[in-house]
C-alpha cells in the first residue's frame, strides 16, 4: 500500500465518517489535518484509527501545502480528499493499480467527481464531468497560493483517471448557503486584487495557455466586465449545459449558483467603491 490520504477538516462530524469509511483499510496512512474543530471531528478520526493533526488555519492552499510539507506520509503517492467527498470502490481499485505499477509517466492525475445536491446526483449543469487534480507523486505537486478555488501545480506530466469520487455535503442547505457566502467574499477579494495588481496566485492566466490558464483568463479578465453575469451563468448552466435535464433539482442548483455569482458581483462592486480590501 503506497498511498497516503490527506483530509483537511473543520467541524466535519457529519461528513467525516463517510470520507473515512472510503479511505481507511487500504491506504498506507490517512491524516486528518484539522484547523480547530469544536465538534466531534477529532473523536471520529481517532476512533477510526487515523492520524489527527491540528494546525491553525492559514487558508485553503497554505493549509494543504503545510500538510504536504510536514506530515510524515509514507506513501509514494498522495490523494487529497475533502471531508465531504467519498472515494468509490472503483476509484480505489484504480488508485491502487496506479500506485502498484509506479511506472506510469504521469506525476499527477485528474479525478472526476459527481455532485449530490438535495439528495440527487447532478448529471448536467456544467458540473459533470468535474475534473480535480487530487492524486500525485509525493513531492511532485503543490497548491498555488490563492485564497479560494486553488489549483494544484504539478512538476511533470498529468493524466486522467477513469473512475469517479462523490461530493456530497451532508450538513444541509443552511451550511451550504453560508459556505458559498464565504466563498463569494473570497472570490470578490481575489478579483479585486487582480484588478489592482495585488494577486499572489502562482498559476498564470492566458488565453493562449492550457485549459485551466484559458479558463482563468476568461474568469478574471473578461467575465468581470460583463453585465448581468448571474443571468448568463444561469442561462449557460440551465440551457446550454442542459441543467433542465436534471429536473427541479437542476433548476434549483443552477439558480443557486447564479445567485452566488451575483453575490460576487455585489461584493466586488463594494470593494471598488471603497478602494481597499
Walk through the language-model features, giving the residues of each:
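Cell-envelope/extracellular polymer assembly enzymes that use nucleotide-activated donors
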Residues: 2-4
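A conserved acidic beta->alpha catalytic loop
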Residues: 22, 26, 34-43, 57, ...
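Conserved beta-strand segments of alpha/beta enzyme cores
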Residues: 29, 51, 157-159
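Acidic helix N-cap motif at the loop->helix transition within catalytic regions
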Residues: 14-18, 39-48, 90-91
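Catalytic-site signature of metal-activated, phosphate-bearing donor transferases
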Residues: 62-68, 75, 79, 88-272
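Short, well-formed alpha-helical segments that are part of the catalytic scaffolds
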Residues: 6-25
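Short, structured coil segments at secondary-structure junctions
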Residues: 26, 47-49, 154
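Conserved donor nucleotide-binding strand/loop of the catalytic core
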Residues: 42-70, 74, 101
